[in-house]
Amino acid sequence: KDEESKTTLVKADVINLAMFEPRKFNVYESADEDVFYINQLVYSSLFKLDKNLNISPDVVSEYSVDTSSGEVNITLKDNVKFSDGSKLDSSDVKASVERIIAAESGSPYFIYASKINRIRINDSRSFTVVFDSASDASLDNLTFPITSAGEYKKGENFAIGSGPYAYAGHESGKTLTLAANKYYYGGVAKLPIVFNIVKDKSVIPGLMTMDVVTAYLNKTVDADAIAQDKKLKYKKIASGELEYLGFNHENKYCSNSKFRIAIAKAIDSNKIIKYNYADAGVTSDSIYYPNFLGAKKMAHLTTNRKKQLSY
């Protein structure tokens, strides 16, 4: 190309995202979806989900599960700090559980913390989580955000956390800014994040073409078509949302295993994924995402119309 048409690439110094103005930013009380995702950036948790939706340690260095007594013994990593430089310790975990329970069903994390009977602290880095029921002694019940025991105030919107980012500023109706947590144990993030607050998310693809927004999450069935139309790069990611078929065994028809098999064989999951979800889905032989907990193989139930009619 000649000099006049030469393209110059400019390195971005900020990540621009988009969000709705939430009703509240409080980590334990907000039910806004955007705030839930922001929580993953601002706060650490004992355990987190990886790209295959498997449970992996976050601020935990060692753990053991006693399923007979319903207890999980945990030792924290030694280098985890909140964004104010203070160390995360056992008392912070205990206080976080108490705050979630105090928020009751208004908290999206209450379903996890409500199963915990108590936190038995051994020292600043080790403690035991005692569950009400032994069957609840599961690591996926320990995926809630951790806040500082001393700094948090009930109902506050921008509590400090120990995640890769920290709240840095909020202009209502306009922007929310996150700065890198310079104490983050996993390494300091290179770029700050600015959330541009919008009233209609349908305008976001257009904002991306103008470089106002760097990236966004699209959960609609035509997400890939929108990306292709706007010439945007996109990547499919795993989701915990699912659809499943359930049977009431008390029903006189559904109590018959042959009847249940006939219905199951009549459903073509691949066609549902293709025509209802524009291929933005996967099949699984359980209610969990494929490869969850190391499951490598799937037991496919082949759709067979003729055999279905024979039951």
Name each region found by the language model.
Residues 281-311:
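Structural transition elements
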Residues 18-67, 98, 160:
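N-terminal lobe/hinge region of extracytoplasmic solute-binding protein
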Residues 64, 109-152, 171:
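Surface-exposed binding/hinge segments that line
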Residues 11-21, 71-74, 96, 127, ...:
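Short, well-ordered beta-strand elements
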Residues 61-106, 253:
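Aromatic- and charge-enriched surface segment that lines or borders ligand/interaction sites
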Residues 85-86, 201-213, 228-229, 257:
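Short helices/loops that flank or line small-molecule/ion binding pockets
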Residues 83, 130-146, 159-201, 223-241:
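Aromatic-rich, solvent-exposed beta-strand/loop patch
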Residues 250, 254-293:
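Periplasmic-binding protein-like
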